[in-house]
Amino acid sequence: YGASTRNAGFACFGSISELLTDLKSHSENDIFDLVEKRWKGLARLRQIIGDQSLDYEPFGGYEIFTSADKLLSDECYEKLNYFNSELHRITGKKNVYGDASTKIKEFGFSNIDRMLINNGEGQIDTGKMMKALLEKCRNVGIEILNGVDVTKIENENKFCRIDFNNGFSILSKKVLIAVNGFA
């Protein structure tokens, strides 16, 4: 449920139009379980690292609609109360979603008819996030190896032996294998 560390630093869990699209192919339970995981994941990240180390800013997330998006815009606005009710249960925030059309001129947009805000979203500095996470790992003796090609992992007595494609091997008490969306 993550994203690349090279993303734009969005701390988000779903716009109304995204959730409406997802509801066409998934159950309500599946969608709101996923939103809850995203919300709790962001809260946990903020707890572990701290807002200052993340450079977290609760600016909100915006969804803009042009005149060509009228049907989608109408559907999103019709479902505001429904989504606010569901997100209140998850986030504890009363009005996660709201109309932000009065900010269109302030933001300097043209050809935008309507705009929604998601008050639960924000931004993070992913570089600072990774720096803080790596520091936490190093402080407890965790070594992270990026960009290595593992050819084999096997048990060797009370250790795991990890073989790399360059002929190098290491022994470790524990191994965590993680991949991102590009692996």
Residue ranges, per PLM feature:
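Conserved beta-strand scaffold positions in the cores of enzyme catalytic domains, especially
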Residues: 10, 61, 95-97, 144
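Class I S-adenosyl-L-methionine
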Residues: 12, 46, 50, 81-88, ...
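Helical element adjacent to the flavin cofactor pocket in flavoenzyme catalytic cores
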Residues: 109-174, 178
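Glycine-rich, N-terminal phosphate-binding loop of Rossmann-like dinucleotide-binding domains
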Residues: 15, 179-180
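Glycine-rich nucleotide phosphate-binding loop and flanking beta-alpha elements
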Residues: 70, 182-183
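Flavin (FAD/FMN) cofactor-binding and adjacent substrate-gating region
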Residues: 17-23, 52-59, 66-132, 157
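Glycine-rich active-site loop/strand segments that organize a redox cofactor
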Residues: 2, 6-37
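A non-catalytic, amphipathic alpha-helix used as a structural packing/dimerization or gating element
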Residues: 29, 33-47, 82, 132
